Amino acid sequence: MHFLAAAFLLLTLSASALAEPVHFRDCGSGVGVIKEVNVNPCPTQPCQLHKGQSYSVNVTFTSNTQSKGSKAVVHGIVMGVPIPFPIPDPDGCKSGINCPIQKDQTYSYLNKLPVKAEYPSIKLVVEWKLQDDNDQCLFCWQIPVQIES
C-alpha cells in the first residue's frame, strides 16, 4: 500500500513538474502567500476542462501561521454564485503537506480536480481555498475555466 502511495505521489510530482504556471487572482490568502499555481493540463487560459477528466493542481505557498491541520474548500462560481465543487480528499495534510504546518515554511499542496460527466458545459471561475484550524485562508486563488464535453 505504501508503494502505491509513493508511486502516485511520484507520478503527481512528475506531472506537475511539466505544468505551466497559471495566472490566478488571489481571493484573500489571509495567513499565507501564494508563490505559484499549476493546473495540468492547462496550456492556455481559460483552462479547458473536459468532462470525465481529472486535473492535477499544485500550489506552492508560504504559511504565515502555525496550524495542526488544513482543509480545502473548492467552489465553482457561476454568475457570481458559489457552488460547492467536491474534491476527493479535502484534507490538506494528505495532499503533500507535512502537518503540523509551521510559520514561515513553504509547502507544495497537491490535489486533483475531477470534472464529472454530468457537469454542464459552461464558463465559470474555480475558487480554491486551503483553510487552517481557525478557518483562515492559507491560500485562496481563482482562475477562469471552460467545462467542455
From Swiss-Prot:
Disulfide-linked positions: C27-C140, C42-C47, C93-C99
Subcellular location: Secreted; Endoplasmic reticulum; Lysosome
Glycan attachment sites: N58
GO cellular component: endoplasmic reticulum; extracellular space; lysosome
Residues found modified as N6-acetyllysine: K116
Record note on modification: N-glycosylated. Found in the epididymal fluid as a 19 kDa glycoprotein that is processed during its passage through the epididymis into a 16 kDa protein.
Pfam families: E1_DerP2_DerF2
Family per similarity comment: Belongs to the NPC2 family.
Entry domain remark: Binds cholesterol in a hydrophobic pocket; there are no hydrogen bonds between the sterol and the protein.
PANTHER family in the record: NIEMANN PICK TYPE C2 PROTEIN NPC2-RELATED, NPC INTRACELLULAR CHOLESTEROL TRANSPORTER 2
Function as written in the Swiss-Prot or TrEMBL entry: Intracellular cholesterol transporter which acts in concert with NPC1 and plays an important role in the egress of cholesterol from the lysosomal compartment. Unesterified cholesterol that has been released from LDLs in the lumen of the late endosomes/lysosomes is transferred by NPC2 to the cholesterol-binding pocket in the N-terminal domain of NPC1. May bind and mobilize cholesterol that is associated with membranes. NPC2 binds cholesterol with a 1:1 stoichiometry. Can bind a variety of sterols, including lathosterol, desmosterol and the plant sterols stigmasterol and beta-sitosterol.
Name this protein carries in UniProt: NPC intracellular cholesterol transporter 2
Native organism: Sus scrofa (Pig)
